[in-house]
Each structure stands twice: as C-alpha cells, then as structure tokens.
Swiss-Prot record:
Gene: eIF3-S8
Name this polypeptide is given: Eukaryotic translation initiation factor 3 subunit C
Species of origin: Aedes aegypti (Yellowfever mosquito)
Subunit and interaction comment: Component of the eukaryotic translation initiation factor 3 (eIF-3) complex.
Classification via Pfam families: eIF-3c_N, PCI
Renumbered residue ranges of the record's region Disordered: 1-31, 157-289, 852-910
Skewed-composition ranges (Acidic residues): 162-181, 207-232
Recorded GO CC terms: eukaryotic 43S preinitiation complex; eukaryotic 48S preinitiation complex; eukaryotic translation initiation factor 3 complex
Length: 910
C-alpha cells in the first residue's frame, strides 16, 4: 500500500525503509507505482530444475514428518517421492547418465535408518496410534521392496556419507550468484525486490561468509537511502518512468565492483580469524553432556605414571559406572586409553588384566536393556577382550582373579598378584548374550549362520576358562563352568560314538559320550545345589538317547526319579526335561520299544502344545490368556533354532506308536463298554476322519497315519505299510533318522506283527481253526514268529484257542458273541447301572427328609429286604437274572414292598 499511496504508513512500508527515515514528499502526486512489474523478469526453468525441485520439496516434507514421527504423512510423502522419481527418470538418464543424484540417495538412506530405528524400538511402537502403527508397517514393507533397486548406490553412499551432494553445491553457487546480482541492482530497482528474496540473500551470506552484521546493515541502509532519494527526486509520474541515462549504468557497475571487493575482504578476514582460533586450541564440545567436569581427565603431561596412579584413575573412571549421565562409549574409550598407557609404561600383567576385566564389564553395561541383545560391533569387541584376558590369565600362573578377594587385599606390584573379579560370571554372561543374538536373528537367513559360527569361539573360550578354574581348584565354580560346557555339548551328535560301538574305531578313542560322562560324574559328586545336578542328569540322558544308548538313558531316568519332582523346578529345567523325554521317546522307537516310546511322548503330545513345552515357539492364544509381560518372558526362554527337535517327526512317531498299540486293543475289546483309550490324541484323529462324509487320498502326515490305521483294522498289513512308508513320508519323517533304512525295516516288521494280532482278534469268531503256515504266508512272517505271537496271545488269555502242533493249526475253542449279542449285553449293563444310581439317589433323599430316630430302623429293614431279594432272585447266571429281575412283575413287587415298609416306618416314627 505504501508504494501506491504517498501518505500511507503501513507495516510493509516500515519494513522496506529504515525506522529513522523522515522524507518530505511532494503534494502533487497522490500515489506512486512500483517498478516490480518492469524489473522482475520471467524465468524459464529447465525440466531438470523442475523435477529436482519437486524431489527436494518432498524430501524436505519427509524430514519434517520424521521429527514428529507422523508415519501416515510420511507414507503419503514416500509414495509421492516414488512417483516424482519416476517422472524424473528421463532427465536423470539424459543429464546424469543414469546415475541417481546423491541427494536422493541421502534421503533414502536417512529414511531407511529412521524406519529401522522406529521398528526396533518395540516399546515406542506400542505407544504409536493405530493409524501410525499401521502406516509404519506398510511403509516398511513398501520401502524394503523399493530400496532393492538402489542397493549399489546406497552401499557407495554408506562408505562416504559425509561427502557433499553435487546438486546441492551447484544450487548454493547458483543462489549465491543470483543473490549477488540482485543485491547490486540500481537503486530504483532495489526497491522492487521482495522481502522473501532479501531473507534468502541474508541467509546465504550468513552461511557462506558468517561475516559481521554491519555489512548487511550498511547494504540495507544504502538501499533505503537510494529508495528515499529516488522518491524525492521526481516531481511527476512521467519523470519517474522515463528511461535511465547511460551514465547511471556506469555508476552501477562501479558500485558492483566496490561491493564485491568488500565481500571478498570480509571473507578473507573471517578465514584469518578462524585460523587464529584453531591455533589458540579451541575444541568442539559434545552437546549431550551438560558440563565437561563429568568427564574423567587423563594424566597431565609431566605426571609420573605408576601402578597406584593408574589404579586410582581406573577407579575414578569406573565410579561413574551406572550413573544417569555417564557416556558409556566414552567410558570404554577412556579404559582403552588407560590400558595403552599401562602397556607403554610396563606396569605389569596384573594391571593389564584388571583393566581388561573392567573393559569387559563396561562393554556389557553398554546395552541398557537386558532383554535385548547387544550390537554386533560390541559383540566382536567383547570376544576379543575376553579372549585376550583369558590368554593373559593362563600365561601367568601367579595372577589370581577371584570374587573372594576383597578390594583392600588386591595386589598388583608383587607376586602372587591378587585381583578382585570373576571371569566365570563374565563368560556365563557372554554365553547368554550369544544365545540372545541367535534368537534375534531370522533362523532361515544367512545372518543366523554367520552368528552360529561364533559358537566355535564361545566354546573355545569356555574350554580356556575350564582350564583356569581347574587350576584354582574351586569345586563350586568348577561345577558351574562344567555345566556351561555340557550345555554346548549335550545336543550335538558325534558319529564316532556309533563307529566305536561297531568297533570301527579303537576302544581308546575319546568320544563326546566319554567327555559327557566325565563332566556329569564330577557334577554329581561335587555339586551342592540340586539345580546343577538335575540339569546335568537331564543333559546326560539326552546325550545317551541321541546316540542310541537306550538302556543307559532309561536306567538314568528310573534311578533319578526326576519325573516325580520335576514340577518343582524352574521353567528352563522343565523345558530341558521335556526335550529329554522327547528325545528318549525317539530313541525307544528306533530300538523297537513302541510301548516305551508312547509312554515317553504321551504327556508331551496330549496337551496339544508341544511347541510351547519344548520352547520352540509360541502358539497364538485367545484373548486374556497370556499378557504381554508373560509373552515377553516366554519369548526369552525360547531355544535357538539349531537346537530344535523336529515337531512333525515327533508327532509322527507318537501317532505310529499309538496306532500299533491302539488298533489291536480296539479289535480285542470291540464290544467292551468299559474300554479305555490308550491314546486320546490318536483316537480323536481317527474319529474326526470317520465323521467325514468324503475321504480322499492322504496328503498330510496325520492323514497317512489314519489311513494306515484303517487298513490295519482289517488286517491289511500291505496297505498299512504302504501308507506309512512311502516317498512322501520318507522325505518328511523317516529320512531324518540316523540309519533310516534300519528304522523302516523295523517299522514294517512291527506292522506285520500287529496286523496279524488284529486279524485274529477281529475274525476269530468266524474260524473254527486256522492254519499257521497260511497265516505266515499271508503276513510274510516266519512260522516261528507266527507261532510265538499266537502262543503269547493264548498265554495272556487274549485268544481262547490252542495250538495243534502235528497239524500246525490254531483251534479256536470259544467264539466271541455276535454284534447283536454284544450290544444287548452293553444295554443290560447300562440299565443296571442306571437303576443302581436311581436307588442311591432315592436313599439320599429319604435320609435327608426323615432325620429322626426311626431312620436307622428304616435303613436296616430296607437292607434286610434287599439281601432277601438278592438271595431269592439273583442266584444263577448273572445275565439271565438281570433280565428276569428287570421285568414288570418284579418292578411292581418291589414298588409294593417299598410302600409297605414306608407305611411301617411312619407308624414307628409316630
């Protein structure tokens, strides 16, 4: 408004001119016009500038959204960025020769770091809103898919992230040149420059030159003076818009040269000042720490370095351990510098061991959350420090590192050296960190394999600690370190054990079974706590079962009586017990002990949660069955993937064992109403298959077992073995066994035997006699084996028959009742049970109603009546008497007797 009305005094006028400016304006022209329309030229931008500007604006928005963690807006901006980059691809291909600009790669790298940081912060993710949480998952998924095309560019950027972006440098130079051109325009044109341009000009000059404010103020005052002079020098509008003289152009060129010279001089003065500041010893202060006094100071240049000075400085550094504002990374750096100083002045191995032990402790403290694993760079440094510390302790016999030594009793100058600390605790924590690192990795990725390679290093560290602890002679610590060694040994299969059994190796060869036996026997003898002994026994059983030492493993289980007291143990020990019983069941199955295998696995499989009981994963639960805290604790107990037991193999062994036991039992007790299920899980699978209206060919492992069970019920061993042993089942289950061919042969032999028993139970009522050679031919078994099976059935009274040796036949003496007869007997038994229960209910009601003295006489008379009725009517055959006693006549008579006795009882009571 001030540009158009001479007398106006608005805010814009005050901004464009100085506050102290007082100008007398002529009264003739009541308004003036701005030169902005004439002086500002239209700028034609190239396609590259347009596309790059769009990308820059989107990247700027993404950085703003990162500050406030607005995931929804960030997802929208990322989609806009992908579309803008697609539009800019022709320009990039033409101008940049297909190389993606560095500022785009920088933005993608920053976004990747931000997404990973937010995703790893599990507590922070829980606090996000539902919309932001959903947008984070979608953004992470889309970004990981989109970033694959920029892998090589990102890798190069990660190598040198601090390098400046080429496009940004060009833009800065361009802006600087534009700002110089704009600030040196003629006084009449300077008035038309917008406020936005002025701010940008000052900012560029501040960033580039960081000069004093006086230069800018001089420039502003010059421009204001020129504008005021311009407004006063014209008396009419016509003179104001006339073309300027040529001499003005010469004056403007001279003004430009002078101002450029002033700017160059200011830059030189600034560089000189910075150089002087660097010479004076200025240093950059970390903004995270409030004061520099919190940092422990190293020694002065002229200080005398000895053992006491170094130990005091070490105590000073470690005194800040655990405090709120302690920089853990800086603390580790100070300790390493202190170790370097101690090595330089040759202060001895004892001081070096003390410092290294404190470095190990500081690395452990670097990770504040105990439930989360440490970073990989800290893990590698931790391994190096512990290996160097143990090597130092083993090389010096006169250094004793123990937690029983008090701080005032430490000795660093004269042998024997005494240091307070516990190397065993450090190694135990190292082992726990290794387990957490494994559980954090994806088990199906190469990262897990890379981390698993560190187990060789961890095992060697434990071996070295075993040597050191054995040298100290402390039985308690020896048991603890032995158990750590057992934990890394018990689940590993050693083929030399089986070769030694087959006498392919000399008897003096030491195997893992011999090593386990030595370690566990020491723990059995010296341990003072039940937990270590229990875990040693379970690990010993597991290792024996893994190498098919069935009898040794079984005897250890029976002698230890762990199954009676294991429910009092801690959860990790109970998990180890479940793993041991599962492996023992597999061992029993490999040895052909089907019943023992079923007994070992039944408690584990009947719950329906073998995955959780073996700590191999969590099954999704219904609402409110497991809280977040419980789920977090249970996830910490999970076993690493390489220690898992194949659940499909375990379930198949259990179902096959149940089939070999349940099908003959069902055939033998088909019409028995009091039949009990041997395996509830197998019975449910069988019943669910029978309820299906249409059953197709088997596909899964369970369907194969159910189809085999149905074939066995009819005595068809060939179809049963085909369903159990085939190409698909071999790949899924049987090829996972050691010596799989032997297991398959044993399984087919058992199927033949149990199919024979099922056939005899099912069809014995059809035959009067059966030929033994015919049975041997039908089931492809030797005659001796058929003879043995039938003899056992006759001895156990499972089959009412006799063997005729001259004719080699089985003579059946009594046939089983028909189906109608069996159902009739079941009905009579159920009716009998119903009547007895009704009588008991009636007696309870009568006893509650009549609570006076005549109650005893009534019960006595009723009991006499029942005894008399039993003596008269329940003699002879039980089934025939049951049918007669349940007739209408007996029911009426019993009812009359009850009424008569009730009347007599009431008369007595009155």
């Amino acid at each position: 408004m001030s540009r158009f009305f001479a007398g106006g005094g608005s805010d814009s006028d005050s901004e464009s001119s100085s506050d102290s400016e007082v100008v007398a304006r002529p009264a003739a022209p009541q308004f003036t016009f701005s030169d902005e329309e004439e002086d500002v030229k239209r700028v034609v931008r190239s396609t590259k500038e347009k596309r790059y500007e769009d990308l820059s604006n989107i990247i700027k928005n993404i950085r703003n959204y990162k500050k406030i963690k607005d995931m929804s807006s960030m997802l929208t901006s990322f989609e806009e960025l992908t579309r803008a980059h697609t539009k800019a691809l022709p320009v990039i291909t033409k101008v940049e020769n297909g190389v993606t600009p560095r500022f785009i790669i920088r933005a993608l790298a920053e976004l990747e770091d931000f997404i990973n940081m937010v995703w790893e912060d599990k507590e922070g993710r829980k606090n996000l809103s539902k919309n932001n949480s959903k947008s984070l998952g979608t953004l992470r998924q889309k970004f990981r898919k989109y970033i694959k095309d920029f892998d090589s560019d990102l890798k190069k950027f990660r190598e040198s992230p601090d390098a400046a972006d080429d496009d940004e440098e060009e833009e800065e130079k361009k802006e600087e040149s534009e700002s110089e051109d704009e600030q040196h325009v003629a006084p009449a044109a300077a008035k038309a420059v917008s406020f936005k341009k002025e701010v940008k000009q000052v900012k560029v000059e501040k960033d580039d030159d960081e000069s004093d404010d006086s230069i800018d103020w001089d420039m502003d005052s010059d421009s204001d003076e020129s504008s005021s002079d311009e407004e006063t020098q014209y008396t009419s509008i016509r003179e104001r818009f006339l073309k300027k003289a040529e001499k003005d152009d010469g004056e403007d060129a001279e003004n430009k040269k002078e101002k450029k010279k002033l700017q160059k001089d200011s830059k030189d003065r600034l560089k000189k000042k910075r150089a002087e500041d660097d010479d004076e010893g200025w240093e950059v202060v970390n903004g995270n720490r409030s004061t520099s006094a919190e940092q422990p100071k190293m020694f002065a240049k002229d200080a005398e370095i000895d053992v006491n000075v170094v130990i005091n400085k070490l105590n000073e550094v470690m005194a800040a351990r655990g405090k709120k504002r302690t920089d853990r990374k800086l603390q580790i750096e100070f300790l390493r510098e202190l170790r370097t100083i101690a090595d330089t002045h040759n202060l001895g191995d004892a001081v070096a061991a003390k410092i290294r032990f404190n470095i190990v402790s500081a690395i452990f403290d670097y990770n504040p959350k105990v439930s989360e694993p440490m970073k990989l760079e800290h893990w590698s440094k931790l391994l190096e420090e512990i290996q160097a510390l143990i090597k130092l302790l083993l090389a010096n016999d006169d250094i004793v590192l123990s937690e029983t030594i008090l701080e005032e009793n430490e000795e660093y100058e004269t042998a024997p050296y005494k240091i307070r600390g516990c190397i065993l605790t450090a190694v135990e924590r190292l082992d726990d960190e290794f387990t957490k690192l494994l559980k954090e990795c994806d088990p199906h990725s190469n990262d897990y394999v890379d981390r698993l390679k560190d187990e060789v290093t961890v095992s060697s560290v434990i071996e070295q600690v075993v040597k050191y602890i054995e040298r100290l002679g402390n039985d308690t610590e020896t048991c603890r370190v032995y158990l750590r060694k057992i934990d890394h040994l018990y689940y590993k299969f050693d083929p030399n054990v089986l070769k030694k059994k087959k006498k392919e190796l000399p008897a003096s060869t030491l195997t893992s079974v011999d090593e386990m036996d030595r370690l566990c026997r020491f723990v059995y003898a010296k341990d003072q706590t039940d937990r270590l002994r229990t875990r040693a026994i379970l690990s010993h059983i597991f290792h024996h079962a893994l190498h098919d030492n069935w009898f040794q493993a079984r005897d250890l289980v029976l002698m230890s009586h762990l199954q009676e007291t294991i429910h009092h143990s801690d959860p990790p020990t109970q998990i180890l017990y479940n793993r041991t019983m599962a492996n023992l069941g597999l061992c029993a199955f490999r040895h052909g002990n089907v019943k023992d295998a079923h007994q070992c696995l039944v408690d584990l499989m009947m719950t329906g949660k073998p995955k959780e009981l073996l700590a191999q994963g969590l099954v999704p639960q219904r609402q409110n069955e497991r809280s977040l805290e419980q789920e977090k604790v249970e996830k910490q107990r999970q076993m690493p993937f390489h220690m898992h037991i194949n659940l499909e193999l375990l379930e198949c062994v259990y179902l096959v064992s149940a089939m070999l036991l349940e099908i003959p039992y069902m055939a033998a007790h088909e019409f028995d109403a009091r039949r009990r299920m041997i395996s509830k899980t197998f019975y449910q699978q069988l019943r669910s298959s029978e309820r299906q209206s249409l059953v197709g060919p088997p596909e899964s492992m369970r369907e194969h077992v159910v189809a085999a069970a149905k074939a066995m019920r009819h005595g068809n061993w060939n179809a049963c073995s085909t369903f159990i042993v085939n190409k698909k089942m071999n790949v899924k289950v049987w090829d996972l066994f050691y010596e799989a061919d032997r297991v398959r042969e044993m399984l087919i032999k058992f199927i033949k035997e149990e199919s024979l028993r099922t056939y005899l139970f099912t069809y014995s009522n059809v035959y009067a006699s059966i030929s033994v050679p015919y049975l041997a031919e039908m089931f492809e078994l030797p005659k001796s084996k058929v003879h043995s099976l039938i003899s056992k059935m006759i001895i156990n009274e499972e089959l009412m028959a006799s063997l005729d040796d001259p004719t080699e036949t089985v003579v059946l003496h009594r046939s089983e009742p028909s189906r109608l007869q069996a159902l009739s007997m079941q009905l009579s038994d159920k009716v009998t049970n119903l009547v007895d229960s009704n009588e008991r209910i009636f007696e309870m009601k009568q006893g509650n109603f009549f609570q006076r003295g005549g109650n005893q006489g009534y019960n006595r008379d009723r009991q006499n009546y029942r005894n008399q009725n039993q003596n008269q009517n329940w003699s002879g055959n039980r089934r025939q008497d049951n049918r007669e006693n349940r007739g209408n006549r007996n029911q009426n008579r019993d009812r009359d007797h009850r009424k008569q006795h009730r009347v007599e009882f009431e008369e007595k009571a009155e």
